Amino acid sequence: MSHHVVEYGQMSFDCFCKICHEKGVAVIVDAASEYDLRTFINHGADVVIYSSHKFLGGPTAGIVAGSSDLIQAGYMQNIGIGRVMKVGKESIFGAIAALQAWKVRDHNAIREKETSALRLWKKIAISFDGVQAEVVDDSTHNPLSRLKISINKEIFKSSAASVATALSSCKIPIIVRDHEIELGYFYLDPCNLADGHAELVSSSLQNVLQNALKKPLPEVDLDKYRNSSIQGYLDWK
């Protein structure tokens, strides 16, 4: 499941599974951080893979669910090529605990807490000329929303990339969703925030935008911005 593909002209998942199964092809879904742990299997997937460290909030590990013969084939890689990538027992027990906690957690209360954070951030963002903010629902239909912050450089005098860079350079870094930063906007994501984190983000956002008003933020080379994480690996001595 990808957040980075076109959102129109796609066949339904049911149809996709039907075509694959008619040709004897198993459907394996990399569901990563999908919220619903049952939908894909219920609609025909043979194997679904979830991260235990994203929405589930567990340690770094993965959960593989589906057809028993394919799961067994995957398990056999414990003595094959997959051995070098195996997780420790701590992560396995942590993933189990995360699943158990997910089953009993109050999802509605968490959703309300996330909505409160979005309102707080939006109030700050729209108080600046040239900055717009709107709450946007998740494009893959997970029950969550994010704050889309759009910056008009002609009015605000600093670009979205410059603001994102400044946020990431705070004493406590604020990392935004910047997949389409070249279009002049980024997203703030309220998922898995601990108590006090929403206020920390709002304070940093306020400070960065306020400082940009006093003096435009340094320009950001978008090519270098896009390659910064890779360049960091290359520059590591």
What residue spans do the PLM features occupy?
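Conserved PLP-enzyme active-site core in the AAT-like
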Residues: 1-103, 117, 122-126, 134, ...
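Conserved C-terminal alpha-helix-loop-beta "cap" of PLP-dependent enzymes
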Residues: 125-221
